[in-house]
C-alpha cells in the first residue's frame, strides 16, 4: 500500500495465487490491499502543475505494458529484459498523447485537477489511472506527489519546456513560502 512503483503488486486468478501474493505483499509492508481486478484495462497517466486551487493538467499518456499490469520491472528494469536499472518512468515506452477520444481525455484531465485540489497538492504530481475498456470507467490508481523525472515528458508534450517547468516550480515554492511567512 505504501511503497508505490507497483512494488509487491500481483494479479491473481486462483486462491493459491492469492495466498502467494499475500505472502509477497506482507514481505514489503504490514498493510496490504486486496481488490477486484480490472481485467481489460489501459493505464492512462496525467500530470498536474500548480498550487492549491490554481492548477493545469498536462496531456495524457498511455505507458506500454508488457503484461496485464504495469509492473515494477516494466517501469524500472526495462521490462525485465536487460536486468539493469533504467531511468524509471521517463524511459518507459509510451504513447503521448494517449490515443483517447477528446471527451475521455478531458474527463481524465479534469479528474486529475480535482484530485490535485482535493489533496491540497503543490508543485507537480502525476496521477495514474486505470481505464476499464469494457465499461469505459476511469479509476484513479495512484497519486505520485513527487513523480520521478517530474513527469517532464508530459509537460514537454503540453508545450512547457523542462527549464520553464523548473522555473514555474521555483515560482510556486517561493509564492508558498511568502504566503506562509505572511501567516506568522
Language model regions located:
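Phosphate/diphosphate-binding glycine-rich loops and adjacent basic-rich segments that engage nucleotide
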Residues: 1-13, 21
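A short alpha-helix capping/helix-coil boundary motif
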Residues: 1-2, 64, 90-93, 129-132
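Active-site/binding-pocket entry motifs
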Residues: 2-3, 66, 78, 175
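A short, terminal or domain-edge coil/loop segment
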Residues: 3-4, 85-98, 174-184
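Conserved beta-strand and immediately adjacent loop positions that scaffold enzyme active sites
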Residues: 8, 45, 128
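Phosphate-binding site of ATP-dependent enzymes
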Residues: 13-88, 92-95, 99, 103, ...
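ATP-dependent carboxylate activation and anion-phosphoryl transfer catalytic cores
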Residues: 41, 99-184
Amino acid at each position: 500500500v505504501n511503497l508505490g512503483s507497483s512494488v509487491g503488486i500481483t494479479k491473481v486468478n486462483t486462491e493459491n495465487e492469492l495466498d502467494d501474493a499475500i505472502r509477497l505483499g506482507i514481505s514489503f509492508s504490514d498493510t496490504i490491499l486486496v481488490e477486484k481486478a480490472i481485467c481489460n484495462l489501459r493505464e492512462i497517466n496525467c500530470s498536474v502543475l500548480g498550487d492549491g486551487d490554481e492548477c493545469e493538467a498536462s496531456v495524457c499518456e498511455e505507458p506500454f505494458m508488457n503484461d496485464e499490469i504495469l509492473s515494477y520491472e516494466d517501469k524500472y528494469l526495462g521490462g525485465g529484459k536487460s536486468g539493469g536499472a533504467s531511468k524509471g518512468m521517463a524511459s518507459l515506452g509510451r504513447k503521448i498523447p494517449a490515443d483517447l477520444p477528446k471527451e475521455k481525455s478531458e474527463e481524465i484531465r479534469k479528474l486529475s485537477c480535482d484530485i490535485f485540489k482535493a489533496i491540497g497538492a503543490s508543485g507537480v504530481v502525476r496521477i495514474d489511472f486505470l481505464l476499464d475498456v469494457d465499461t469505459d470507467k476511469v479509476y484513479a490508481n495512484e497519486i505520485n506527489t513527487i513523480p520521478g523525472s517530474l513527469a517532464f515528458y508530459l509537460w514537454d508534450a503540453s508545450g512547457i519546456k523542462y527549464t520553464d517547468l523548473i522555473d514555474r516550480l521555483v515560482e510556486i515554492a517561493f509564492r508558498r513560502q511568502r504566503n506562509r511567512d505572511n501567516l506568522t
